[in-house]
């Protein structure tokens, strides 16, 4: 139970889970633990690994973990936490994204002990008749208990009928897999409960539910999301990961320790006490960044990332910056930053100039109207973006 509950938001129903654990221990039959992810983006970020870490902990206890790729449900679009209809993905987008999902998840899970499934296996054969029969097992009133549906209904925001199907299809996954426990973020609680109810309808023992907190992004405000730009991708370069993790606030660091670190809780509590007594929290942040980077890359990469970070902090330039060859001199500074790939747009370039975040050969550029002449120089935007530009 201690492993199950570490860092979790809610365990339903705790007494039932204890009974399942006891039965598994007595019979030697591992419990079936399910986690489903819709491949809505091509990469996994560390926010996704909060539930993956929990899966790995339960996997290490000998239970059977099932990594479910929602290739069917992705064509519907999950309405969880949405204030408008989520556009469904095409089959081509789903297939392209799914290719990287399991490979990246295997950085956390033990692939030799992981059952990988696609929910199109049982959802596609249902057909219209099967889906209608499934829909008959749940009422509109129950569906409207969802907080996001209720808010949209009261606000007069349209709710499409197909959005009601999403939690039903996700719940049917639990029936097909005969899961004993389903994991998900706190925003998935309703969907997980639907699975529990549908299992009862199909005469199965209902699954227990374990919800994990949604990881707050680097900004410390909103949940981690690629669309919000406040994320750390698990496939990012070690130096980039290190810089991003060192940018989080000292308070947020402890949340990251609880949800992302494999260190014993007693050790984390001791570090908190040491910081209270005067230890520099930066030291603890370095340890966290190195642990996460070593998990997805290597310990050697983590050490090199620390060296690079310290080098930059002293005003140094990284050794491995890209070299960009451009023509058109003289050229406006904002346009040059865009062409060099250091800023996504000229407006973003101008914002960085206004904030004093642009340097050429170590000199801060404050003139947005600057015309840059031909030459070779190092350009820097913020603390982590560098390029050696050869302009002709």
Swiss-Prot record:
The record's subcellular locations are:
Cytoplasm
Can you give the residue ranges of the S4 RNA-binding domain?
Answer: 331-391
Reactions it catalyzes? tRNA(Tyr) + L-tyrosine + ATP = L-tyrosyl-tRNA(Tyr) + AMP + diphosphate + H(+)
- Please name the InterPro entries in this protein's record: aa-tRNA-synth_I_CS (IPR001412), aa-tRNA-synth_Ic (IPR002305), FHA_dom (IPR000253), Rossmann-like_a/b/a_fold (IPR014729), S4_RNA-bd (IPR002942), S4_RNA-bd_sf (IPR036986), Tyr-tRNA-ligase (IPR002307), Tyr-tRNA-ligase_bac-type (IPR024088)
Gene3D superfamilies on file: HUPs, RNA-binding S4 domain, Tyrosyl-Transfer RNA Synthetase
- List where the protein spans the membrane: none
Tell me the keywords, alphabetical order. Aminoacyl-tRNA synthetase, ATP-binding, Cytoplasm, Ligase, Nucleotide-binding, Protein biosynthesis, RNA-binding
Which EC class, in a word? ligase
Residue ranges annotated as motif 'HIGH' region: 39-48
GO molecular function per UniProt: ATP binding; RNA binding; tyrosine-tRNA ligase activity
Question: Is Amino-acid biosynthesis given among the entry's keywords?
Answer: no
As given in the record, the signal peptide range reads none
Cite a single GO BP annotation.
tyrosyl-tRNA aminoacylation
One Pfam match = tRNA-synt_1b
Function according to Swiss-Prot or TrEMBL: Catalyzes the attachment of tyrosine to tRNA(Tyr) in a two-step reaction: tyrosine is first activated by ATP to form Tyr-AMP and then transferred to the acceptor end of tRNA(Tyr).
Assembly and partners are described as: Homodimer.
What is the name attached to this protein's record? Answer: Tyrosine--tRNA ligase
Q: Which species is the source of this protein? A: Ralstonia nicotianae (strain ATCC BAA-1114 / GMI1000)
What high-level taxonomic lineage is stated for the organism?
Answer: Bacteria, Pseudomonadati, Pseudomonadota, Betaproteobacteria, Burkholderiales
